[in-house]
A protein has these predicted regions:
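Short acidic loop-to-helix transition motifs that present clustered carboxylates
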Residues: 121-123, 144-149, 169
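Aromatic/His-enriched, Gly/Pro-containing loop or helix-boundary segments
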Residues: 2-3, 174
Length: 186
């Protein structure tokens, strides 16, 4: 019997890194450990980000990425490395174990869903293009205030948007949000 309220939680890493880390899906039940709360057979997820957060965090330290183009370039370089890692793993070739590359290889094999923190329509479209180039699936764009601009593209690719109903304009990449966004994307 469900009486409403929150029944399931997806816990994701933050949005400072292009590749933030894995998520976990939990049932909102009393348990002594996280393992006791895990939602049975829930798909695994990977949090990614684009836009201002990664470029601000790394660019302010004089590191890559420091621009939006840099975000995409580092993403592409990383997916190329992941594909090579995946090919060697599939061929049974010996290589140094790399947990990050294992995660990305699992994304490329469809075992892990991608959740991308991305506000702007142009960046979402670029991420979709990259996902097609490397053969992975983007499940959801989070904070995607410009989803309404590419609702048809999102629909064609089976991608969800996790949106706020009435919060936008609080930073540069959120300026083009509109209150009608959710009905336009639905």
């Amino acid at each position: 019997l469900a009486n409403g309220g929150v029944t399931t939680l997806q816990i994701l890493p933050g949005s400072a890194n292009l590749f933030g880390g894995r998520s976990v899906t939990l049932k909102n039940v009393p348990a002594r450990t996280m393992q006791g709360m895990k939602f049975p057979d829930a798909p695994q997820g990977l949090k990614m980000a684009c836009g201002e957060n990664p470029k601000r965090v790394y660019g302010s330290k004089g590191r890559e990425p420091s621009t939006r183009m840099g975000n995409m370039a580092v993403n592409r370089q990383t997916w190329i490395k992941a594909r090579e890692y995946q090919k060697k793993r599939a061929a049974g070739k010996e290589q140094t174990r790399d947990l990050g590359m294992e995660t990305l290889a699992d994304v490329l094999e469809g075992k892990i869903m991608v959740h991308n923190h991305c506000y702007r329509a142009d960046e979402m479209a670029n991420v979709i293009d990259m996902s097609k180039e490397f053969g992975y699936k983007v499940s959801t764009f989070h904070h995607a205030v410009e989803s309404y601009k590419i609702a048809d593209l999102l629909r064609e690719n089976g991608i969800c948007s996790a949106l706020w109903g009435d919060w936008y304009g609080f930073k540069m990449e959120a300026y083009d949000g509109i209150k009608e966004s959710i009905p336009l994307v639905h």
